[in-house]
Design a protein with these regions (language model features):
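Membrane-embedded alpha-helical segments of multi-pass membrane proteins
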Residues: 122-130, 172-180, 216, 321-326, ...
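Membrane-interface helix-loop junctions at the exits of transmembrane helices
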Residues: 32-41, 68, 107-114, 147-169, ...
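Active-site-proximal, structured, solvent-exposed surfaces of multi-pass membrane proteins
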Residues: 9-10, 14, 661-792
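Periplasmic/ER-lumenal interhelical loops and adjacent helix-loop junctions
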Residues: 52-55, 59-72, 239-242, 246-336, ...
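Contiguous transmembrane helix-bundle modules in multi-pass membrane proteins
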Residues: 188, 192, 211, 342-501, ...
Length: 792
């Protein structure tokens, strides 16, 4: 098909270098990870998000989508609702930010579930190889010698952004796939090729909707800067083709985009806007210095800073560093070229980086600061650098000295006098982590020294590109090992037993008593519920069911990127049907000191100590009383969990429609919120609980016997994607307790089925299914047309 064939200009010499680039990037990535892979016995673990989320998510979702765990739901629907994700969440919406649309994740489904922890490094190697290959294809257009395109691809793949974001893992998917889309845009603009751009738009959209928003903005900047520089002529036909393929690509990815958008719009973290001065300036001066130096110095570890004590720095992916040379090549290019589109693109990106409202435009105007879009200008910086290297007339050594001076100037942060406000004693330096700073500065200056030497000795010789490539790859390998090591061993005191706990959890999964209930953990590693395939109160993940983000805060429980209700909130355990709590032998005494009297020792299994909740209430129960949301919000926050064991919270509208089935809670009952009364409330709720409750991979099935018509409450996060069936008849679902669900059931023995399909999936699936034949016909037409032209 013509739409998917390289033009003659791209074949031959270029194709050989493409596979060389892929191989070199794969080899370099493998060498970076090899020491840690061997140290960890194949189960590579790093720190923070990589350990807590990425390993767990990849392994869990591999089994979930293959049907491991819970049975299919009502009507045969399956694999749409994950019980192990927080209190339960729609799978597509919870994981589309992390992996649901990633081609690398879907590739990993070829392997058994238990292999996944050991495949994290091979998958990362593959991602870096794909990143290098895509960057090579893009950069080949802008150099005469393909060896410099190989160099640029290495600069991009092993940039500071690439190494930093190993910590987040799924960000590397974005690094890998973006250059292919930019290459496809160039092919459309310059070669008038058809199909590739639509295809890569769809792939990048499916891969990560969050990053796709920023990619759209960057493509607009890229297109306008190139057009304004006169690098191509925009005709009505070209504009129409670009518009059509853009829309077609979005339509192909619409199956994931639309349900995710509907879910994300309910997430407070995505719609919290800044205002006033917050639009225009950062609140801390250090933020500006950090942004500027992040383009010059090698990156710190994601969770600790070398210099900065203020500003939003950690976990932001704030780095645009190019390995070995930093911005030395960029400065040489900048001085030599006039009216160049790449200079315009970088200038615009720098303005966007320094103005909060413009920076947040890459994330749909979210107020949280991130620099996770820097990988896109990094590709342009790599293009500028290799273009400068290819020009023998440019002075490459002088800019290296200028960048080195900027790096050396940061010693001021280490040498500035500081007087302690309390003791009045003087000391030197404001560094937050002197050891890491020394390592970063040493690599920055050392890289420039090697680069300066290579330029002075070999710039005018044919081996220049090969010497630079050797330097870039060697530097990337060494710095990559040190960078990962700083982050990994910085948390070694807490993460050294991570593999043991996760492996023990797999054994415990087989030894737990049968039944469908929730668990809680105390001072274990994150996301243990994903390894046990159980809904767990302790969960670390940004994109769980949005209603959780209203339910928990109403109880005074913080819910930002994790759910972590305090052990002291004992009533929450009864409300949410927690039956067992897990801790380790090392923390058993500490648990005894903190826990209420409602826990009794159950057993010690597979390295864990289990406690049973004496106030456990099976999931699905009824109430005698109700409260309005207004009354509920007027109560004291710390004891609201106790109150929810006594009365159901209804909206004003639902009180009108369903209040007849319950009695308004007497005023006197609002105050008796002691532990003793809580145990009685649990007994009352237990008496009306469902006789059967079965979790499914699409919701749940329940059976109950009621002496009168009543609202049956389920501590499952409300979601517009749920459909409820009572005795086979579709029934309205009530949003109660500011985020959970209830349904009206008649008197007698009833069966209840909740079935989940992502809200908006019917429309999104229809759009994508309609777009597929359009895409095939579109590309097929131009393939046939090209074939006819070749014959003649």
């Amino acid at each position: 098909m013509t739409a998917f064939h390289s033009s003659p200009r791209m074949l031959g010499q270029k194709q050989d270098k493409f596979w060389l680039t892929v191989g070199l990037c794969a080899l370099t990535a493998a060498l970076i990870f090899l020491p840690f892979y061997l140290l960890d016995g194949g189960f590579f673990h790093y720190a923070g998000d990589f350990n807590s989320q990425q390993i767990s998510f990849y392994r869990y979702m591999n089994g979930f989508l293959k049907g491991a765990g819970y049975p299919a739901g009502y009507g045969g629907v399956k694999n749409t609702f994950s019980w192990a994700t927080d209190l339960g969440s729609g799978t597509m919406n919870a994981y589309s930010f992390y992996l649901y649309g990633s081609p690398f994740f879907w590739f990993s489904l070829l392997f058994p579930q238990n292999w996944l922890p050991y495949l994290m490094v091979p998958l990362l190697v593959l991602k870096f190889a794909v990143a290098g290959g895509g960057a090579y294809l893009y950069l080949r257009r802008y150099v005469k010698d393909p060896n410099f395109a190989v160099l640029g691809a290495a600069l991009y793949a092993f940039s500071g952004w690439g190494l930093y974001n190993i910590f987040f893992n799924h960000f590397i998917d974005v690094l890998a796939l973006f250059p292919w889309m930019l290459w496809a845009l160039d092919e459309t603009i310059y070669e008038r090729r058809h199909g590739w751009f639509a295809f890569w738009v769809a792939v990048n959209l499916l891969n990560n909707y969050f990053f796709f928003v920023g990619q759209v903005l960057f493509l607009v900047i890229y297109f306008v800067c190139k057009l304004s520089a006169g690098e191509f002529r925009l005709t009505p036909r070209l504009f129409g083709q670009l518009a059509f393929e853009s829309l077609l690509g979005v339509a192909l990815g619409f199956v994931v985009l639309w349900p995710t958008v509907l879910s994300v719009l309910q997430n407070p973290r995505t719609i919290d806007l800044s205002s006033g001065w917050g639009f225009l300036t950062y609140s801390k001066p250090q933020q500006y210095l950090a942004i500027l130096l992040s383009w010059v110095l090698p990156p710190d570890s994601p969770y600790m800073t070398s210099i900065w004590s203020e500003g939003i720095i950690k976990w932001t992916s704030m780095t645009a560093y190019l390995p070995l040379c930093s911005l030395a090549g960029v400065v040489a290019y900048w001085r030599a070229r006039q009216g160049d589109s790449k200079k315009r693109i970088i200038a615009v990106c720098m303005v966007f980086a320094l103005v909060p409202i413009l920076n947040s435009a890459f994330y749909a105007l979210n107020s949280s600061y991130y620099a996770r879009w820097f990988y896109m200008p990094v590709l342009i910086l790599a293009a500028m650098t290799v273009s400068a290297w290819e020009d023998p007339s440019l002075d490459l050594a002088r800019p290296a000295r200028s960048i080195a001076f900027v790096m050396i100037a940061t010693l001021a942060f280490a040498l500035v006098p500081v007087q302690d406000a309390a003791t009045k004693e003087w000391s030197l330096g404001v560094l937050q982590n002197p050891g890491q700073y020394c390592a970063v500065l040493a690599f920055g200056l050392g890289g420039l020294a090697v680069y300066h030497c290579i330029c002075r000795r070999w710039q005018q010789r044919r081996v220049f590109a090969r010497r630079l490539l050797a330097g870039v790859l060697a530097f990337s390998c060494l710095f990559g090992i040190v960078h990962i090591g700083i982050g990994k061993f910085g948390q070694w005191n807490t993460d050294s037993d991570l593999v043991e706990q996760y492996i023990n959890a797999l054994a415990l999964k087989e030894d737990l008593p049968e039944g469908d209930w929730r668990i809680d953990t105390y001072k274990t590693h994150d996301n243990l519920g994903l390894w046990l395939d159980k809904s767990c109160l302790q969960y670390f993940g940004s994109t769980a069911a949005p209603s959780i983000l209203s339910f928990y805060p109403a109880l005074g429980v913080k819910r930002d990127v994790r759910s972590q209700p305090e052990l002291s909130n004992y009533a929450l355990r009864g409300l949410l049907s927690v039956r067992y709590l897990l801790t380790t032998l090392a923390h058993q005494e500490q648990f005894h000191a903190e826990a209420d009297e409602g826990w009794t020792y159950y057993d010690t299994l597979d390295g864990y100590v289990l406690y049973e909740n004496q106030n456990y209430v099976p999931m699905g129960f009824t109430y005698d009383y109700y409260l309005t949301e207004t009354q509920y919000e007027d109560t004291v926050t710390p004891t609201r969990s106790n109150l929810l064991m006594r009365a159901l919270v209804l909206t004003e509208e639902d009180v009108v429609a369903y209040g007849q089935y319950l009695t308004p809670l007497p005023t006197a009952e609002l105050n008796d919120l002691t532990y003793t009364r809580y145990t009685q409330d649990c007994t009352d709720r237990r008496a009306s609980a469902c006789t059967t409750f079965e979790m499914t991979s699409a919701g749940f099935h329940a059976e109950a016997t009621l002496d009168r018509a009543n609202l049956m409450f389920f501590s499952v996060p409300y979601d517009d994607g749920f459909t409820a069936y009572v005795d086979g008849q579709e029934t309205e679902i009530l949003r109660v307790d500011e985020g959970l669900m209830a349904v009206l059931c008649p008197a007698g023995t009833v069966t209840i089925d909740f079935v989940y399909q992502p809200d908006g999936i019917r429309l999104s699936r229809t759009v994508t299914l309609a777009a597929l034949p359009v895409f095939l016909l579109y590309t097929g037409h131009f393939a046939w047309d090209e074939k006819k032209r070749r014959k003649h």
